């Protein structure tokens, strides 16, 4: 049995076929092209179809898809009709108190920019949830863990008059691992898949990557890179630091400490290493102050996973072992973990990650 894993990027779709024993059957990335980003979400389904055709041509056996699992960037906002406000588009909004929410400022911006579409749209989604809606006709919002509620919204803040009827347009929360719906017949025919395949949502790509690197227990650490880079350290105490972003883990009672290097892809290798080194030292200091053991091994994901020469240089510089997993795109493995957990193949997300996340190569610092 395999899960069809889909991670929605800003300009491309990553698609993986991953088995219940963690085998990466196939991975493909394909750009979606549109003259404007305003309806870019409408390209996702056609891009997925194109990728599935390519994957089927490359395999000699049936895909045997038992579930579909979706993750993606955010907070991207999409209307029921596919009008899209990407996460990286910044607009000034009216002075509305949105607390610590990552989504409400974007939702307000959508309302102000696209007033007519806002009025006629039954729902407003984040990107992955819109794709779930497209596949199943079910409207949901994935809440990674109950403590994330302030990063989304709650009834109290939505009752403020400034938000008008926004509450009516936001689909209900579902838990990670909860079935979001089933593939409807028309979409199944279009994609040439079986009808009623269960569909799951792993939510934000950040969450999917933490699951897909198994950064789900105290002392685990991962380095996720793309246009920017982040070191993520799992701890069992809520810690605040001026240079660290603290967020809940998807595992209750655990927390994730993130040290971010914005636009790291534009930096030279040496400057990148210095920035990451600074982050590692800060996290080590935090670990020492809180009687936590700092790990000797760090899991990497993203584009850097393919650059063994740079990773060896990073291992030497940080004096840490670097683990490269059998899938360079951890989000896809995270998607698979969510689906197989939802299908009751595992008792917890952590059990799923323990089984599906596989180290392929370990680089050790040279003396």
Task: Please annotate each region the language model reported.
Residues 1-30, 35-36, 66, 70-96, ...:
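Glycine/Thr-rich phosphate-binding loops that ligate phosphate moieties of nucleotide
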Residues 8-10, 98-204:
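Gly/Ser/Thr-rich active-site cleft segment
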Residues 26-61, 96-99:
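N-terminal phosphate-binding loop and adjacent alpha-helix
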Residues 46-50, 105, 109, 208-210, ...:
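Short amphipathic alpha-helical face segments that pack within enzyme cores
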Residues 49-66, 113-118, 157-167, 191, ...:
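Phosphate/pyrophosphate-binding loops at sites that engage ATP/ADP/AMP, CoA/4′-phosphopantetheine
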Residues 52, 107, 129, 154-155, ...:
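Generic structural marker for isolated residues within well-ordered, non-membrane alpha-helices
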Residues 76-97, 125-130, 134-156, 197-271:
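Glycine-rich phosphate-binding loop of actin/hexokinase-like ATP-binding domains
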Residues 97-108, 190-194, 219-223, 341-356:
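A polyampholytic, Gly/Pro-enriched intrinsically disordered region
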């Amino acid at each position: 049995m395999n899960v069809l894993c889909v991670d929605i990027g800003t300009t491309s779709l990553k698609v993986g076929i991953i088995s219940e024993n963690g085998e990466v059957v196939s991975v493909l990335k394909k750009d979606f092209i549109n003259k404007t980003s305003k309806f870019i979400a409408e390209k996702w389904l056609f891009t997925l179809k194109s990728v599935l055709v390519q994957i089927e041509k490359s395999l000699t056996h049936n895909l045997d898809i038992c579930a579909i699992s979706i993750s993606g960037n955010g907070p991207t906002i999409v209307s029921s009709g596919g009008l899209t406000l990407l996460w990286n588009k910044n607009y000034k909004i009216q002075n509305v108190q949105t607390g610590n929410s990552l989504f409400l400022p974007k939702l307000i911006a959508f309302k102000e920019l696209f007033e007519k579409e806002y009025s006629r749209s039954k729902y407003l989604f984040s990107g992955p949830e819109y794709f779930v809606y497209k596949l199943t006709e079910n409207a949901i919002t994935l809440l990674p863990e109950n403590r994330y509620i302030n990063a989304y919204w709650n009834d109290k803040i939505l009752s403020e008059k400034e938000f008008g009827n926004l509450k009516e347009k936001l689909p209900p929360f579902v838990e990670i691992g909860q079935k979001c719906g089933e593939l409807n017949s028309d979409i199944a025919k279009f994609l040439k898949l079986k009808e009623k395949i269960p569909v799951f949502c792993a939510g934000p790509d950040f969450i999917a990557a933490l699951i897909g690197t198994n950064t789900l227990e105290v002392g685990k650490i991962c380095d996720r890179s793309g246009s920017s880079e982040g070191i993520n350290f799992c701890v069992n105490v809520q810690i605040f630091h001026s240079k660290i972003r603290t967020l809940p883990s998807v595992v209750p009672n655990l927390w994730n400490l993130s040290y971010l290097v914005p636009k790291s892809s534009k930096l030279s290798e040496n400057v990148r290493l210095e920035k990451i080194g600074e982050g590692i030292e800060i996290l080590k200091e935090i670990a020492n102050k809180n009687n936590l053991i700092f790990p000797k091994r760090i899991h990497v994901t993203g584009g850097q996973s393919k650059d063994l020469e740079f990773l060896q240089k990073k291992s030497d510089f940080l004096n840490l072992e670097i683990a490269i997993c059998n899938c360079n795109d951890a989000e896809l493995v995270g998607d698979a973990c969510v689906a197989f957990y939802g299908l009751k193949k595992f008792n917890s997300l952590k059990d799923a990650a323990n089984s599906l996340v596989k180290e392929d190569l370990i680089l050790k610092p040279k003396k």
